[in-house]
Amino acid sequence: MATVLDTPVAVRRAAMDLLARREHGRAELSRKLRQRGASPELIDPALDRLAEEGLLDESRYLESFIASRARGGHGPLRIREELAQRGLPRADIERALNACDIDWSAQLREVWRRKFARLPLDAREKAQQGRFLAYRGYSMESISRLLSGRSDD
């Protein structure tokens, strides 16, 4: 049975339920509430109040999202694009990526080691490994350095 989101209390409760599961960005939370039938006139004040109370925090969401995706083996390029698709400002994304203490080179080597564990023997293997790592969100420069055997250790 779907809850009707036609009062400020109902919208706030639905927003808090979503935030209890995981961090959300303002744009994502607004979209989810609209999908559940809440009107923008009710959503904006509810989200403003949650932000004032510290329950909705974009920087905390960015930090959580970046850490989660990095643990999953994704690189900074893919994470940056996913966050932009979720409606977050590019400047905030860049600030969060620069502030995180993730060693992207070590992350790249670990992702590569888990998947392939050996340098490519021919051009076809090198292309295959490169495509996989590029899809994961690592720069071509870092990938090229790794696959040619030059490490920045």
From Swiss-Prot:
InterPro entries noted in UniProt: RecX_HTH_1st, RecX_HTH_2nd, RecX_HTH_3rd, Regulatory_RecX, WH-like_DNA-bd_sf
Coiled coil stretches, renumbered: none
Keywords: Cytoplasm
A Pfam family the protein falls into: RecX_HTH2
Record-level GO BP terms: regulation of DNA repair
Compartments reported by the entry: Cytoplasm
Gene3D superfamilies attached to this UniProt entry: Winged helix-like DNA-binding domain superfamily/Winged helix DNA-binding domain (1.10.10.10)
GO CC terms in record: cytoplasm
Biological role stated in the UniProt entry: Modulates RecA activity.
Protein family membership: Belongs to the RecX family.
Protein name: Regulatory protein RecX
Organism: Pseudomonas paraeruginosa (strain DSM 24068 / PA7)
Source species taxonomy: Bacteria, Pseudomonadati, Pseudomonadota, Gammaproteobacteria, Pseudomonadales
